[in-house]
């Protein structure tokens, strides 16, 4: 029989599963890596579940743990030697559909950003407000706006260099 804590945690996971997968997908396209990262985030959430003091919203807490875990995982992966996968994933986008191709190109450009900028863009794309982004990322609200503006400029420049 499950205790109260386990039931509460299951509800939290049900409610924030999409959010966690969004973070995972922003940091990897490999299905196995995404699942590994998802599991690692769940472990971190479980370990921190008792310590959550509700000084911020649950949404902010989940995003912060998910992003920090993804960023740390990304840093560890960069220190590992590169390997060549045995199989390649099939691109789910139809190359005939130009709007999907544009989205794919945008995500490819976003993935070229450093991990902190990627995290910031992810939160913004998820529709999170500047106040909550600031709380999650540990920066000021003004800095969120400045960073997003600079990231957008960077993405525009990168997209121009790709199309020319």
Which residues does each PLM region occupy?
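Structural recognition of an alpha-helix C-terminal capping motif at a helix-to-coil junction
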Residues: 22, 36-43, 56-68
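A short, charge-rich alpha-helical start-of-domain segment used by transcription regulators
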Residues: 1-22, 35
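Arg/Lys-rich amphipathic alpha helix in sigma70-family domain 2
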Residues: 51-53, 64-84, 99
């Amino acid at each position: 029989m499950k205790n109260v804590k386990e039931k509460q945690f299951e509800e939290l996971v049900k409610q924030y599963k999409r959010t966690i997968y969004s973070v995972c997908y922003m940091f990897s396209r490999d299905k196995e890596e995404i699942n590994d990262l998802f599991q690692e985030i769940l472990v971190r959430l479980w370990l921190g579940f008792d310590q959550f003091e509700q000084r911020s919203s649950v949404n902010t807490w989940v995003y912060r743990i998910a992003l920090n875990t993804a960023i740390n995982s990304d840093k560890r992966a960069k220190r590992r030697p590169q390997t060549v996968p045995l199989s390649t994933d099939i691109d789910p986008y139809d190359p005939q559909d130009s709007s999907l191709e544009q989205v794919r190109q945008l995500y490819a450009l976003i993935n070229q950003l450093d991990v902190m900028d990627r995290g910031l863009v992810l939160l913004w794309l998820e529709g999170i407000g500047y106040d909550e982004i600031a709380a999650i990322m540990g920066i000021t609200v003004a800095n969120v706006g400045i960073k997003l503006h600079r990231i957008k400029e960077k993405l525009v420049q990168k997209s121009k260099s790709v199309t020319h």
